[in-house]
Amino acid sequence: MRKIDYHMHTHFSGDSEASPREHIEQAIRMGLDEICFTDHRDFDYPIDTFDLDTDAYFMELSALKNEYVDRITIKIGVEVGLDMDHIDEINTFVAQCPFDYVIGSIHVIHHTEFYYGEFFKGKTKEEAHREFFEETL
């Protein structure tokens, strides 16, 4: 069985300060065969900035990919915040970048981040779940 991790965030993401090298070294220590960096890119995140400097991202990760080629397989991906208000921008962004892997995640519904709980105020559990599932369709 191959051991892989395809969901890793680095200092390129607003939610991490870790360096890609730290992740790579830890993955090797843990015996992983393959990893994929999937830093965030959200187009309308209401709290923090989840922009992604793709030029710097690909430059740093490509250099590390070459450096570690004999020790671990490294892929370059992205976690895109799915937001139907920005679907054209998202599709253009993904098409323009040579990502090996793309995760689509819902972080925001109706300009509200639900991680911090504001999204759930005044809603039943069923109402909140319905809005989430409708956003995924």
What positions do the PLM features span?
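An N-terminally biased module of ancient metal coordination in phosphate/nucleic-acid-related enzymes
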Residues: M1-M84
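Extended substrate/RNA-proximal surfaces in nucleic-acid metabolism proteins
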Residues: D48-L137
